[in-house]
Amino acid sequence: MSIPVKKNLVSEAKYALKCPNAMSAEYITIHNTANDASAANEISYMIGNTSSTSFHFAVDDQEVIQGLPLNRNAWHTGDGTNGPGNRKSIGVEICYSKSGGPKYEAAEALAISFVAQLLKERGWGIDRVRKHQDWSGKYCPHRILSEGRWDQVKAAIEKELNGGVSAKKAAVSSSASEYHVKKGDTLSGIAASHGASVKTLQSINHITDPNHIKIGQVIKLPQTASASKSHAASSYPLPSGVIKVTSPLTQGTKVKQVQTALAALYFYPDKGAKNHGVDGVYGPKTANAVKRFQSVSGLTADGIYGPKTKAKMEEKL
């Protein structure tokens, strides 16, 4: 089910200020708003003020609202009048980032799904996603960066993108060596869902342009690609039962298994520590990593590892 987008578009009379140039987008840029306003308020303020600063979408915990047409540029990345961020990227603001908490976590989760939707609609891969910092060095998206989670957010977008393809379109068994292209397929999506690279599929199928594949076309797969997902899951065994923060703290092999799997999914217990915080101790930082994983996976974000969290982790590994 696609995520609906409400439109509150800037008046054409303000195009010269907010979005003066025609645009054929090539990237999606993620921002944090650095305040606690809703998406509706963000867009209303953006289109109503006299500043040139602008962006295409605002996402909060409830909805996605569009403020600029996608065929017009926005001034949102700080890389100058002709910079590719300002001239060729779609700006997505994630709301409630100042205070964080459950509302921000829900907004981020919705933004992850929405960015994946934008990628799917355009046949793009995760390589099209950028953070504001990439264009001009600004420390944005500030909350994601301060929590050391940019890689995690990108991984979550990619999982969402590839998961949709895998669930709906990958009609091959784990032992299959070819794939029949269906309506809506992209080569990047096929590659990701079978553990291969686009370049590999281009090479073994003699495909010159990866953006041009046809419905019904047979795509040969590398011999080991279709088995990669099951291999990845078996490489990260997860314990049964419930693990949470206790006094004294729970320790041991089971905790280390959970931490190792979290790190493999880019949800590091403590990215700056030795082994990214994989120490076999279920403390507040590990609970926070579990909570962050839960918040972007449609689960109750309580920081408690249990059967539902285990199943979702196994699905994503």
From Swiss-Prot:
Keywords: Cell wall biogenesis/degradation, Competence, Hydrolase, Secreted, Signal, Sporulation. GO terms for molecular function: N-acetylmuramoyl-L-alanine amidase activity. Gene3D superfamilies: LysM domain, Peptidoglycan recognition protein-like, PGBD-like superfamily/PGBD. Residues 1-39 form the signal peptide. Residues 177-221 form the LysM domain. InterPro entries: Amidase/PGRP_sf, Amidase_domain, LysM_dom, LysM_dom_sf, NAMLAA_amidase_2, Peptidoglycan-bd-like, PGBD-like_sf, PGBDSf. Residues 40-142 form the N-acetylmuramoyl-L-alanine amidase domain. Its EC number is 3.5.1.28. Transmembrane segments: none annotated. The keyword Cell wall biogenesis/degradation applies. CDD domains: LysM, PGRP. One of its GO terms (cellular component) is extracellular region. PROSITE patterns: LYSM. Pfam families: Amidase_2, LysM, PG_binding_1. SUPFAM superfamilies: LysM domain, N-acetylmuramoyl-L-alanine amidase-like, PGBD-like. It is found in: Secreted. It comes from the Bacteria. It catalyses: Hydrolyzes the link between N-acetylmuramoyl residues and L-amino acid residues in certain cell-wall glycopeptides. One of its GO terms (biological process) is peptidoglycan turnover. Belongs to the N-acetylmuramoyl-L-alanine amidase 2 family. Autolysins are involved in some important biological processes such as cell separation, cell-wall turnover, competence for genetic transformation, formation of the flagella and sporulation. This is N-acetylmuramoyl-L-alanine amidase XlyB. It comes from Bacillus subtilis (strain 168).
